[in-house]
């Protein structure tokens, strides 16, 4: 996406904008500088008013408080309160749902992501990773060089294909899925009408897929949502569509960003890379540290009740960003918080969120991330950024942080 239409940020403390391209690129430095200079909550008048707590304590306080903060909108954009479906259901349950409805909507989806359901996917994920590496390396050989894009040729395909198969969507539509993800999570500073048109395209695609499942039922998540009951009644069409959209978008962008960030770290920290190649049994522990240090997800809340939040006068319908990755780098919560220690054992990170909306797909995300790193290192044990300065690495914009373009050179 081009530079945001609000213009460049003048001061991160009073004019913070997560859609500024500099934000995700330099986020850890921005968070640290703000907190060290006495700003634990940043503010901005953009998007109609937005607050961003930066400490673990303050992020957790908002995440656990469902009375003063609503989840009916979780992606900050130019849209106003009137543009979102009312609580407690919201447009993409359960992530946009408030209590008490949230509990029931979430409970419907939990069985599909239980460990015993997710574990059998490992072989399929491993085969998919190997196929993507085969394709990327073959393309490099045809060009006669030793560079591949670890993001666009590898990381971005894995979760898109996996969640498509789980939902019952055509895996060959993964380019479409990537477009939907961009429109939902990165194109946030565009006009409301244009953003609405983007969601209309997603809805139209999902309506076609839902109609096909109604005519041809099968054993997948879409058919499950069409047949399950809530309070003795089938789910409403908007509930079905919203939950599918949630699983597609949340299941793709967060995990591909985590995979990409992990590979970026290994490309820029050769000692860590060599250590994991020599001792692959450390990879599961390293994965947890990558999730802590490079947590991809920042959620949002909408202020439901006017109140003073630690000296911040929050008004009804103000936005509140919840940067879980900033919480993960708070030295009050983690020893040596700004260091990436791939053998860190005590690691109660918030990469999957805090409170009632903690990610229900964490078992799947961990499996995809672990297998993706294992297969990459088994096939490409030595690599570095194609440009040592990292100038050709492109980071996302918006609430999901990760490399969108990650050229690496195979050594």
Where are these regions (language model features)?
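Cytochrome P450
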Residues: 1-411
């Amino acid at each position: 996406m081009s530079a945001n239409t609000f213009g460049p940020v003048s001061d991160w403390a009073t004019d913070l904008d997560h859609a500024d391209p500099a934000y995700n690129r330099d986020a850890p430095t921005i968070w640290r500088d703000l907190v060290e200079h006495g700003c634990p909550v940043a503010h901005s008048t953009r998007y109609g008013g937005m607050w961003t707590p930066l400490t673990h304590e303050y992020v957790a306080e908002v995440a656990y408080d469902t009375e003063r903060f609503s989840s009916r909108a979780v992606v900050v954009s130019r849209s106003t309160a009137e543009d979102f479906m009312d609580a407690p259901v919201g447009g993409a349950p359960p992530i946009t749902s408030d209590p008490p409805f949230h509990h029931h909507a979430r409970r419907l989806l939990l069985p599909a992501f239980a460990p015993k359901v997710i574990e059998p996917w490992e072989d399929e994920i491993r085969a998919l990773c190997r196929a993507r590496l085969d394709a990327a390396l073959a393309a490099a050989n045809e060009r006669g060089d030793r560079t591949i894009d670890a993001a666009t040729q590898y990381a971005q395909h894995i979760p898109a294909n996996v969640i498509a198969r789980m939902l019952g969507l055509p895996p060959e539509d993964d380019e479409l899925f990537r477009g939907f993800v961009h429109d939902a999570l990165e194109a946030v500073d565009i006009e409301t009408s244009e953003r609405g048109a983007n969601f209309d395209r997603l809805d139209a695609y999902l309506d076609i897929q839902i109609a096909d499942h109604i005519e041809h039922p099968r054993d997948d998540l879409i058919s499950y949502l069409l047949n399950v009951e809530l309070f003795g009644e089938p789910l409403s069409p908007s509930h079905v569509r919203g939950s599918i959209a949630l699983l597609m978008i949340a299941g793709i962008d967060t995990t591909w960003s985590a995979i990409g960030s992990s590979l970026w770290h290994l490309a820029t920290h050769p000692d860590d890379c060599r250590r994991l190649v020599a001792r692959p049994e450390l990879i599961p522990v390293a994965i947890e540290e990558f999730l802590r240090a490079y947590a991809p997800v920042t959620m949002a809340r909408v202020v439901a009740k006017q109140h003073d939040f630690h000296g911040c006068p929050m008004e009804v319908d103000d936005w509140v960003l919840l940067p879980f990755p900033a919480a993960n780098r708070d030295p009050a919560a983690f020893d040596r918080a700004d260091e990436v220690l791939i053998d860190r054992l005590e690691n109660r990170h918030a990469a999957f969120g805090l409170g009632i909306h903690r990610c229900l797909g964490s078992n799947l995300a961990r499996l995809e991330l672990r297998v993706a790193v294992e297969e990459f290192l088994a096939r490409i044990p030595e690599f570095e950024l194609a440009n040592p300065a990292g100038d050709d690495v492109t980071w996302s914009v918006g609430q999901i942080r990760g490399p969108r373009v990650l050229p690496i050179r195979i050594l």
